Structures are given as C-alpha cells and as structure tokens.
Amino acid sequence: MDDIFGDIFGNFFHQKRQQDGRAFARKGADIQANLHITFEEAAFGGDKIITLTDDNGQAQSLKVHIPAGIDTGNTIRLRGKGSLGTGGGENGDLLLHITAGSKTGYERKETDLYTTLQIPYTTAVFGGEARVQTIHGDVICKIHAGIQSGSQIRLKGKGIVSMKNPSILGDQYVTVQIPVSYTHLRA
C-alpha cells in the first residue's frame, strides 16, 4: 500500500518538477565558520582577508568587512558565499561567528571599557593630573584632591563605537588605585 501511494505521489511530484524540463531551484546550504579577530579589529572595524575551502576543496580568499563595535557572539553574514545552489537556485550564505580578542589592561562591557590607573599617594592627597591610556590615544585626566582608591573616573566617549548606531561611542571607566607604601603608614 505504501508503495502505491509512493508511486502515485512520487510520480506526481516528479512530473511537477520536470514539467518545464528543469528541477526546482534550491538554495545552497548556509556554511558556518568561526572568525577570530583582534581587540583593535573589533573596536575600529576594517577589512580582513580570510581563506576558506569551497565545495570542491579549492581554497578561496574572501574580503570580509568587520564593522566597528562588533563583539564576541555577533555574526557576520556574507550572502551568496555559502554552498552552491542547485537547479538555478541561489547560493547559501556564509555565517561567520565572531570571537573578539582581548587587550591587556582593558575589560570590555558592550561599548564601555574598564581600566585601572595607579597614581602616587601624593597625587591622591593633593590632586593633580595623570596620563590615561585610551584606545583613542592618551588623555590627561584631572585628579581631585582626596580621591580614594577604588574611585572611578569616567572618560566620556573614549570607549568603543556602537555597532547599531555608529554616532554613539561608549565610555571608558578608570578605577583609581593608590599603592600604599609602608613609609606612609608610620606614625
């Protein structure tokens, strides 16, 4: 009984597919791959050449645009760069799953960056200025007299650009550390 239905429906679909002499167009499969990028590539974006092996085992170089602000867990879709379609169907897509590297001294939380800054005890007591490294270059930061170890200084617009809205920059939060030497503790 299954064979009868199989023959009837199989022939029906076979005839339907072959009516105009062609098979139905079928989109190629999407290909998934991991792409490791540097902290700087994630923060500032840019183009990167990657090499992949195609369906025929041939190495293929592709230029990939990395949008500024991308982060680990995001995906870049390259339309038409996946497996070949059949019957005139379009090619599948290449999905690149991003893993962004880290940078010593920086912690990233979305578009904001967190760093630490050691200042001398005398600067903490009397105030002054300190040079702070940012991904956009060094800045001079005002240190208020009496600042406490663990205090945070916000550097507005010194973080990472928002991938969703490139006109928005995150902030850099600098946690002040005041090393205490034993000479300052003597009574």
Put a short name on every predicted segment:
Residues M1-D55, T86-N91, L95:
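Post-J-domain flank of DnaJ/Hsp40 co-chaperones
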Residues S61-R186:
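Intrinsically disordered, low-complexity linker/assembly segments
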